[in-house]
Amino acid sequence: MISAILLAAGESKRIPLENKLIKSFKGKPLINHILKSLIKSKVNRIIIVLGYEHIKVKKILLKSTKIILIRNKNYKKGISSSIKYGLKKITKKNKGFMITHSDMPLIKSSHINKIYVSLLKKNNLVHVMKYKNRIGNPIGF
């Protein structure tokens, strides 16, 4: 089993007065672009870590049996606190997991599947996406 931790707890401080995750991008909430890609991918479970405005974000999320919602009440402590909350849901059944940000609307299920396959082949390495020689997210472990 490979799980994905989708980080969705931040305060969106760079966009004042709005939560960017619920803001519309190409006709749907920003978070639902990456979520749709995760749902369509081979990933077995999607652990969504909510925090800031968790009720508003939860209301607009796509639905799937793959999704597990958790709430980071300490989201103001930063991204590492959300990663820790997500990691608590990774079990021994997992051969690997990936961490992705929820504000990445251009990530497709094919990108996620590349990390998924790579994790199954060599799960003792860190797996990253690369574009034009730049390393980025999502990251697999």
Q: Where in the sequence are the language-model features?
A:
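A short, conserved beta-strand element in the Rossmann-like catalytic core
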Residues: 12, 56, 105-106
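Conserved beta-loop-beta/alpha segment of the NTase-like Rossmann-fold superfamily
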Residues: 76-137, 141
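Conserved N-terminal catalytic core of the sugar/cofactor nucleotidyltransferase
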Residues: 33-96, 109
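Short, well-formed alpha-helical segments that are part of the catalytic scaffolds
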Residues: 20-21, 27-39
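Conserved beta-strand scaffold positions in the cores of enzyme catalytic domains, especially
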Residues: 22, 69, 126-128
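Hydrophobic packing residues within well-ordered alpha-helices of enzyme cores
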Residues: 15, 57-61, 115
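Structural beta-sheet core signal
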Residues: 4-6, 47-48, 98-99
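N-terminal nucleotide-binding beta1-loop-alpha1 segment
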Residues: 1-16
